[in-house]
C-alpha cells in the first residue's frame, strides 16, 4: 500500500475533514459520512429512519431539484451512491478529477439543505416497501436478521437497518425531516476526499461551504 499522507482537521463547528492527494489516476472520490444509523433512531427505533433518509437526500435541496442534482453529476461524469448501516450513513460521488469541487458542492448541499419533498417521499416509501418484499424472499438476508435478533436481544442491533415494516409504515415525512435536522449537523459529519486533487483547494472549498453552518 502507498504511504498514508492523509491530512485531518476539524472545523470550528465540529465537522471533520480528511483529505489525501493521490495522483495514481485522474479521479477523485468525495464522501460524506454521517454518524447516524439504525441504532440512533431513539423513539422511532425499528422504523428505518436513517435508511429512508439516505434515499431522500438527493431528492431536492433549497436550490436544486432532484433532476438538477442528477444532471450536475452527469455533466462531470460522476457516479453517486450511498448506504446505511447500524451506526453510520455514507454518501459518495466518484468523479474525474475536474469534477471534485462540483461533487463537494452537491454533497454539502444535500447534507445541509435537503427539503425532502413530500411527493418524492411518497415515491421512496414505495421503493423501500419493495425492498422489504425482496428481503423476505432472500434466505440469506432472513438468516442474518434472525441471527442478529437472537444474538442482540436487548441491543438495537437486533433490528434490521431497513427497519420493521409495521413500524416503517407509520413514519411520516415530518418525522423524517425532524430526524434529518437533528442528526445531519456539522459536528456529526466527516467529509473525506481522496484522489487527484489539490489539498489546499479542497480544504478552502469545504471551509467556505460550511463556514455559516453552526454546531448543534
Task: Show where each model-derived region lies.
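Beta-lactamase-like hydrolase cores
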Residues: 1-13
Amino acid at each position: 500500500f502507498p504511504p498514508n499522507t492523509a491530512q485531518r482537521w476539524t472545523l470550528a463547528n465540529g465537522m471533520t475533514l480528511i483529505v489525501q492527494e493521490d495522483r495514481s489516476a485522474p479521479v477523485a472520490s468525495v464522501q460524506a459520512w454521517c454518524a447516524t444509523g439504525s441504532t440512533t433512531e431513539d423513539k422511532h427505533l425499528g422504523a428505518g429512519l436513517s435508511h429512508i433518509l439516505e434515499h431522500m437526500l438527493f431528492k431536492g435541496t433549497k436550490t436544486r431539484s432532484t433532476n438538477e442534482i442528477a444532471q450536475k453529476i452527469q455533466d462531470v461524469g460522476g457516479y453517486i451512491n450511498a448506504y446505511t448501516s447500524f451506526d453510520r450513513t455514507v454518501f459518495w460521488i466518484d468523479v474525474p478529477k475536474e469534477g471534485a469541487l462540483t461533487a463537494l458542492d452537491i454533497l454539502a448541499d444535500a447534507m445541509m439543505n435537503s427539503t425532502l419533498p413530500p411527493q418524492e417521499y411518497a415515491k421512496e416509501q414505495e421503493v423501500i416497501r419493495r425492498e422489504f418484499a425482496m428481503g423476505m424472499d432472500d434466505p440469506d438476508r432472513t438468516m442474518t436478521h434472525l441471527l442478529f435478533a437472537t444474538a442482540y436481544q436487548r441491543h438495537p442491533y437486533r433490528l434490521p437497518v431497513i427497519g420493521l415494516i409495521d413500524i416503517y409504515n407509520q413514519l411520516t415525512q415530518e418525522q423524517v425531516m425532524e430526524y434529518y435536522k437533528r442528526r445531519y449537523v456539522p459536528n456529526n459529519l466527516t467529509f473525506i476526499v481522496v484522489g487527484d486533487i489539490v489539498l489546499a483547494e479542497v480544504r478552502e472549498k469545504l471551509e467556505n461551504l460550511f463556514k455559516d453552518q453552526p454546531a448543534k
